[in-house]
Amino acid sequence: MDARAAISELVVANRVVAQLKLVDSFGHVTVRNPENPQRFFMSRARAPGLVTKDDILEFDLNSTPVDLRGMRPYAERFIHGCLYKSRPDVMAVCHNHAHELLPMAVTKTVMRPALHSAAVIGHEVPVWDIRDHFGDGHRHD
């Protein structure tokens, strides 16, 4: 797959996750650039159901845009960049704001697997907190 095909699939992925209501207006999907694994593609800050190929931006693994072309990027791009940087085997990421999980996140409630098929997770569900990497209140845009 080349970069152009990856961008086309990324546009379709955005539309599909929106249509299936897997993300709301604030969720997003990214894909690693197959021609340069040190970069990834992500749409500009826009509802996934509206994304077109012209909305796709490229970022390095520090989440620095290659060329913004006057568009505003998602602030959450840092989550994606950190995942791609730490996991070279990851080729795509979908981030959403699961309303069912938000109360657990803001109250620091430990999430535990409740089904036998989730036993591979361990005793607690791992949580990645952006503050551990970027601190509180620091603006990165």
Give residue ranges: language-model regions:
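Glycine-rich flexible loops
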Residues: 1-141
